[in-house]
């Protein structure tokens, strides 16, 4: 049987591959590499997007980016070639980036659409395609439904090489990270310089290794160490998600090094996790709650907060005590972003570690969240545990954790990611 090897993966020849349906979930299209995530399917998604682009009479370039995963770079080229073949201008990143970088770029240029190649926090053998709408917002269901319908009725795929796209003036390539980081810095207001704060970073071999240390250094922090940095398409055997289990694996190293705070991020750097100065895991709801309290009580900002149904009532209690409203939406960060626009909310986030702020991008971003959290730590001059304690105490909130598990019968029906 014929096989192709890429980054240590072995894929069966296309004649042996089952035809998988392309379905978009709350985080875009995701699939196992060599099964549903194939060159053929990636190009189908690009052609469907091209069709919708022309149906909407869109005019601006489509920003295309990619992360560290296997086939991400190649897929960004496949996407671009199809868009160029449909006479659509493309702004293609020349460097791997976090997902929020392409969202920020799309928003900054006011683009109608954007594309990011990533499977976010999924295991190493997955990859995916995220589509962004106007101003860099995650694609909503009406758009993804249209894309699925277009895919099911495609009669062919138009393509154009990158070289030809350049000759036609349709393709521009750039390095978006610098502008992205400068935009984050415009939201940061540090009054107290605390370069001695000892910070441990764990990007879990994801694109956070490109941004976290840079942003903190620009903010004046100098005592920074990173573990699990650089690119490893298998993420060192770890699930590339800063879960409590993953963060607690860093605890011994953290305590031995006498760090003040640890920050963990997922593979495309849109989720954040924190260890306090005792090496204790800080719940994502408490991160969001502390930041909301800080922005209103200490920075004098105003506004409601948005959470999803999987988030804690801590946020409701805080909002009530502060004189604002906590709005609850369904799972999916695009629902949080939509509600933030509707209510002009100050902050929005979810219990899995994603958050954003009014005026910033319409999507979660852990580089931004890291900068905001370390601003809070610096300005308040308190250990992380005391900051969390203060916001919880203000809300009269106590946390009781009860762990349980569920099991499901294997029906043999396919599951789409």
Regions found by a protein language model. Give the residues of each.
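N-terminal small/polar loop signature for handling phosphorylated ligands or for N-terminal nucleophile
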Residues: 51, 61-127, 215-275
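Proline/glycine-rich low-complexity loops and linkers
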Residues: 94, 149-182, 277-351, 356
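Phosphate-binding and adjacent anionic-ligand microenvironments
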Residues: 261, 301-417
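Aromatic (phenylalanine/tyrosine) cluster motif
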Residues: 9-11, 20
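Buried hydrophobic positions in well-ordered alpha/beta secondary-structure cores of metabolic enzymes
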Residues: 27, 64, 102, 115, ...
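Gly/Ser/Thr-enriched, mixed-charge loops and adjacent short helices
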Residues: 127-255
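An N-terminal, well-structured beta->alpha segment
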Residues: 18-87, 112-113, 166-198
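Targeting/processing segments of secretory and organellar proteins
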Residues: 1-3, 8
């Amino acid at each position: 049987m014929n096989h192709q090897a890429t980054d240590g993966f072995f894929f069966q020849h296309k004649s042996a591959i089952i035809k998988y349906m392309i379905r978009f979930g709350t985080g875009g299209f995701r699939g196992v590499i060599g099964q549903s995530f194939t060159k053929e399917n990636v190009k189908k998604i690009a052609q469907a997007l091209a069709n919708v682009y022309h149906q909407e009479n869109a005019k601006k370039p489509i920003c295309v980016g990619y992360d560290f995963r296997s086939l991400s770079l190649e897929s960004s080229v496949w996407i671009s070639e199809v868009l160029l073949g449909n006479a659509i201008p493309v702004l293609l990143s020349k460097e791997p980036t976090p997902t929020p970088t392409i969202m920020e770029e799309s928003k900054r240029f006011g683009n109608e659409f954007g594309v990011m190649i990533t499977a976010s926090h999924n295991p190493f053998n997955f990859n995916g395609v995220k589509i962004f709408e106007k101003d860099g917002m995650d694609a909503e269901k009406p758009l993804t439904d249209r894309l699925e319908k277009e895919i099911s009725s495609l009669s062919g795929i138009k393509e154009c090489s990158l070289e030809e796209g350049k000759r036609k003036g349709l393709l521009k390539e750039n390095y978006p990270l610098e502008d992205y980081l400068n935009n984050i810095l415009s939201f940061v207001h540090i009054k107290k310089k605390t370069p001695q704060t000892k910070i441990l970073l764990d990007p879990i071999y994801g694109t956070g290794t490109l941004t976290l240390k840079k942003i903190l250094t620009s903010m004046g922090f100098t005592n920074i160490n990173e573990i699990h940095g650089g690119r490893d398409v298998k993420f060192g055997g770890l699930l590339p998600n800063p879960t409590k289990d993953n963060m607690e694996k860093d605890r011994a190293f953290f305590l031995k090094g006498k760090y003040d705070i640890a920050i963990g991020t997922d593979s495309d750097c849109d989720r954040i996790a924190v260890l306090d100065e005792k090496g204790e895991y800080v719940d994502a709801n408490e991160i969001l709650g502390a930041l909301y309290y800080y922005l209103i009580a200490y920075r004098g900002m105003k506004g409601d907060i948005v959470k999803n149904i999987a988030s804690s009532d801590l946020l409701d209690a805080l909002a009530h005590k502060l004189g604002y409203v906590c709005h609850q939406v369904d799972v999916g960060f695009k629902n949080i972003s939509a509600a933030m626009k509707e209510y002009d909310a100050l902050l929005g986030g979810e219990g899995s570690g994603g958050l954003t702020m009014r005026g910033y991008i319409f999507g979660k971003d852990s580089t931004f969240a890291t900068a905001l959290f370390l601003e809070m730590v610096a300005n308040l001059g308190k250990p992380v545990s005391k900051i969390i304690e203060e916001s919880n105490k203000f809300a009269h909130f106590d946390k009781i954790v009860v762990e349980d598990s569920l099991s499901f019968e294997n029906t043999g029906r396919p599951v789409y990611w």
